[in-house]
Amino acid sequence: VIGVKVQAEAKPEPLPVVLLDNQTFQGKVGYLAYQVVSVGQDPITLALLELGFVEGLRTRDSLPTVTTLTSPTNVTGRLYRKSMNPLSSELMPEMGEGIRVQNLNISELNELLNVELMPAVLQPDNLENWAYPFPWNPLPLTSAKHFGYAVQWFVMAGVFLLLTMVVCIRWFRKAVSQGGEA
């Protein structure tokens, strides 16, 4: 399901905006903003809709005001899942006008908001004149690039094998020339 192109009518839900902390884009520090929307009707399916990169304020005492969807909007885009940080995957929410989180842990966010969110995030690609840029644009690799990377790794493995053999042969010759056993 991840990476799949989707189309849905996103209806804003009366829940706070989620701001993923410690994001950078074009040399600026800020947040990735998400809005909870319903994308299905029977049963209602809730999802996080990525709103884009929101530049942070000079002080961390307050959160930036985020422009959100205010009415149902037909959205096309891709589904993706944020990879978990192996050192810290906890949500660590800070409540305010929105919710500042350190990691996008959907299961903990479900508990915090008392809802059931889809395990993937919807990144729209059809929002015209939108206030925020989208820093991550998935670019699929062509088969030629995959083949190129495979050749590159194969050549690196071959060079490593060759260097290892040269070192072992030199060590063996040195040991034999000094009268010792290999």
In which residue ranges do the predicted regions lie?
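Surface-exposed, charge/polar-rich loops and edge strands
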Residues: V1-A182
